Amino acid sequence: MQTLDVYQSLWAMEQRHPRKPEPSAEENFARIAEAGYTGVCLDPSVPEIPETRALLPLLQKYGLNCMLNVFPHSVAELRPLLELADEMNAELVNIIGGVMPVAVEEAVPVAEAWLRTSDDFSFPVLFETHRDSLLNDLFYTLQLIERVPDMRLCADLSHFVVNREMRLPLRDEDRAYMSTILNRSDCFQGRAQIGRA
């Protein structure tokens, strides 16, 4: 039987209100647990490893699973981020790669190196479609996944929809492109907005 696990991104809990203090990490974890989410999604780059590691006791206290969206800015930076994910018992890791060669051919060895690094870990490692990252562009992504057949994706389609200014009804070509992305995806990122006064 299939199940759907839903994780709340910790960054999305930020209020960003100029006259209100931000809730503490503990308050956010408590709210996430109370709302019934499977777990929390954390978003570290290498310099943020210590502060991310410090959240492990809150995951344990509130019985929440962990997934990481990691931001490596070199091929070598992926390993310490995956080691952090292993320490935190992450269920899943999404790479939002800060290595962005202009030519697809130059991205192939980057993706392949990250896949080899991920082979040393037991959790799934996916590549997220995301603005300002390796998979910034729909056409670039389609070409790269064709050249690297083992790449599995986390689809954040909003970046492609906005980037391409897609309109409804979708053109047949756009539908086919999106179907290709979805067929290579094991995870999805999405946003829900609740209007607040």
PLM-predicted stretches and their roles:
Residues 9-16, 43-47, 69-73, 98-100, ...:
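Active-site beta-loop-alpha junctions enriched in small/polar residues
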Residues 17-20, 105-106, 165-168:
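Short, solvent-exposed loop/turn segments at secondary-structure boundaries
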Residues 25, 52, 77-78, 104-107, ...:
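Aromatic/hydrophobic pocket-lining residues that form the small-molecule binding cavity
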Residues 77-126:
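Glycine/proline-rich, flexible active-site/cofactor-binding loop segments
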Residues 120-196:
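Acidic/histidine-rich catalytic cores of soluble enzymes
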